[in-house]
Amino acid sequence: MAIDLVGQKIGMTRLISDDGSIMPVSVIKIEPNRIVQTRTIDIDGYRAIQVTTGKKVNKKGEAKVRRISAAIKGHYAKASQEIGLGLWEFKLEDNEITNATSIDISLFGAGHYVDVIGKSKGKGFQGGVKLHNFQMQDATHGNSISHRAIGSTGQCQEPGRVFKGKKMAGHMGNKQVTQECLKVVKVDIEKSVILVKGSIPGAIKGFVKVSLSPKKDNSNKEVSKNIKNQVTNEVDQTKQM
């Protein structure tokens, strides 16, 4: 199971290659994910890490902790971590290392393929034509008012009802969407930003989860630093302190 990182969608831009071709890319800012809690099989029954990212600050850059409950403050204090913008939990395999204090963007490298999970933009209540791509009814020929109506949904006397799961008008968007196998075009470790080819789900400043795609072979790609080495180095530094 790949280790996920939490980032924020900054927007989209384009890269122009030497031959003049244009590539649309999405910009994801991934600040270091600080580990707040490590769940173990002995205590919790499964292995996982709970991470946070960013800092809660006001417009002046001061820490914004007024509306945070004492329980959450104590949860962060127990891990000696600053209060972040949220908490996310990722399950781990038995052979994955969890003795780190944080995981950063060096997990990814140019040429890697990643999966991005985000929440799609909410479109509100929409009809069947927009939500499910239903065909519209006649614009004329005696049709009045019901141009965009979905039409008949039930049967006659038998069964005389509408089956569950029938596509109808309803809320559109605001659901979890996974975009698979997106190629990492560029990694900027200093700015904590990665560029991936194509679009990703969600609105600007929305949180997304990024992980190496299990459907692609990422083992032979060049990376800035292996995640295992990163974790080991942090553990060694902690012991020296």
UniProtKB/Swiss-Prot annotation:
GO biological process terms held by the UniProt record: translation
Highest rank taxon of the organism: Bacteria
First and last residue of the signal peptide: none
A GO term for molecular function: rRNA binding
Modified residues annotated as N5-methylglutamine in this record: 157
Keyword Ribonucleoprotein among record annotations: yes
SUPFAM superfamilies per the UniProt record, alphabetical: Translation proteins
Cellular-component GO terms for this entry: cytosolic large ribosomal subunit
InterPro entries in the record: Ribosomal_uL3, Ribosomal_uL3_bac/org-type, Transl_B-barrel_sf
Record keywords: Methylation, Ribonucleoprotein, Ribosomal protein, RNA-binding, rRNA-binding
KW rRNA-binding (keyword) present: yes
Modification after translation: Methylated by PrmB.
Function of the molecule: One of the primary rRNA binding proteins, it binds directly near the 3'-end of the 23S rRNA, where it nucleates assembly of the 50S subunit.
Family according to the record: Belongs to the universal ribosomal protein uL3 family.
PANTHER family linked to this entry: 50S RIBOSOMAL PROTEIN L3 (PTHR11229), LARGE RIBOSOMAL SUBUNIT PROTEIN UL3C (PTHR11229:SF16)
Assembly mode: Part of the 50S ribosomal subunit. Forms a cluster with proteins L14 and L19.
The protein's name: Large ribosomal subunit protein uL3
UniProt source species: Vesicomyosocius okutanii subsp. Calyptogena okutanii (strain HA)
Source species taxonomy: Bacteria, Pseudomonadati, Pseudomonadota, Gammaproteobacteria, Candidatus Pseudothioglobaceae
This protein's encoding gene: rplC
